[in-house]
Amino acid sequence: MEQPFTHSGTRDPAPSPREQENAALARQAAAAGIVLLKNRGVLPLNPGAPVALFGAGAGRTVKGGTGSGDVNNRASVSIWQDLKGAKAALYVISRIAGEGKDRRLEPGDYYLSDAERADLQTLDESGLPVVLLLNAGGPVELTGLLDGMQHLDAILQLSQLGQQGGQAVADVLLGRAVPEGKLTATWARRYDDIPCARAFGSLKGDVSQDTYRDGVYVGYRYFDSFGVRPLFAFGFGLSYTTFALRAAGLDVQPGHLAVQVEVANTGARFAGREVAQVYLSAPQGELPRERRRLAGFAKTRRLAPGETQTLTLEIPQKQLAAFHPEQNAWVVDAGLYGVWVGNSSDALRLCAMLEVDAAVTLERTHPICPPQHPIGELGAAPGAQDREADQWRQKVEYDLPVYKFVPVAPAAPAPAAPLLAEGDLDSLVPLL
């Protein structure tokens, strides 16, 4: 009998309607994910402006990850392919990253190569505006460039854009799409500003064990709590227009919190979308707590100049909780919580206070893999108590509202992990 399933793809040389629809969606999604890190008015480009294209990444565009992150597609559009007719001036830097292709702390990867630095220096000396495109799945060290280049007028973080990446880049550069992406990681000024910078075994010549001591201070929560200024903050991303955000109200009920954020397009030329972000700060007590924690976010519809939209962000009560290891429980501690609104982790405004009178346990856990020895995690950030007191000062100065918040404990305890009934960890390992 003939085997019907012998080929995983298509043998038809012509793209199907489904492929064409998916390609259009991929182009739209890629453009929406591009992050504008800097713009001194050079973007969007005039399609008729005589400019130049540099950088090996222009023709060797990285579409995605490696290993399990790789996908097979019919064809990919490079940045060069879709811009050679538009006369765009760019310098493109590409980096491969993915499963089995971890980034390296060396020139040509996390750091710029000597050739890239020389190219950019030559462009800077020409006096022409320089537009830098970063086709990389994570940060590239740029502190020296930003400090030393006079004509680095725009930076776009493309990440890995998929098969329609070239078209998406052209859409953003030429103003057919307006940037609306936000950074999902903090970009440090120096690599060693990252608390786990030296934890990776590949840097120590021993990949058998990595010890992470960040504790609750992972990513932006470390930079924010310890007062380390990043190059680009978590949640950051510019637009071709400007937005104003303000807290429009809070709905506080037992076990429920909702924050209304009004977003207005204050620009005069471009329609665009903005992401409203709500963060919570917690009382500093017996446990180390981050200065602020992202609790919710939402994106507006496409707002025309002068248009306003009010978003409602539902905040689960667990966002107020901290994990108490000695209790194996998530607990909302008694004390004062701050509600912050903004559009990145370093551009926030305190808009209200929540006061919890008594601690409430929301969830109990059952450890399967308890630590075998102390890890020595980071302790409380210096000045944490002072920052908490500063919230009260802001409350008085700005007459901020204070809401009583009553956490609601679940009616029944969380079920035990079913594997625990089989024995201890050592006896379970062969089963995993």
Residue spans for each PLM region:
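C-terminal non-catalytic regions of proteins with extracellular/luminal or membrane-system context
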Residues: 1-432
